[in-house]
A protein has these predicted regions:
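Residue signature of alpha-solenoid helical repeat architecture, marking inter-repeat boundaries
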Residues: 1, 37-39, 83-85
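TPR/TPR-like (Sel1-like) alpha-helical repeat modules
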Residues: 54-75
């Protein structure tokens, strides 16, 4: 399966409350073959998931590459990934501000 299929399957599983399968599907989307857009979307969803779980180190692992590549992603994909880039930046900012709560 390619990244887009893993992403769609994971979103469906998460919407049905199948958390473990959804997370594994998102990880497969990030690690597998496929388009960069789907991989970026999966990274942001995983990052948000780990922020909500209070696992900020794991969240940074997925959100960091999106924030670091933001300029290139914007140049290459115009505004297609703007929402994901903004969300990654916002979540990383939250981690910086409130990370002490998880310690």
């Amino acid at each position: 399966m390619d990244a887009k299929l893993y992403l769609n399957k994971a979103i469906m599983q998460l919407s049905r409350g199948l958390e473990e399968g959804g997370v594994q599907g998102l990880k497969a989307a990030v690690e597998g073959e496929g388009d960069e857009v789907s991989k970026t979307q999966a990274r942001v969803i995983l990052g948000e998931y780990y922020v909500m779980k209070g696992d900020f180190a794991q969240a940074r692992e997925y959100l960091g590459p999106v924030a670091q590549d933001a300029e290139r992603l914007r140049d290459q994909y115009d505004d297609l990934l703007d929402d994901e880039i903004c969300k990654a930046d916002m979540l990383l900012d939250m981690i910086e501000r409130f990370g002490f709560l998880a310690e």
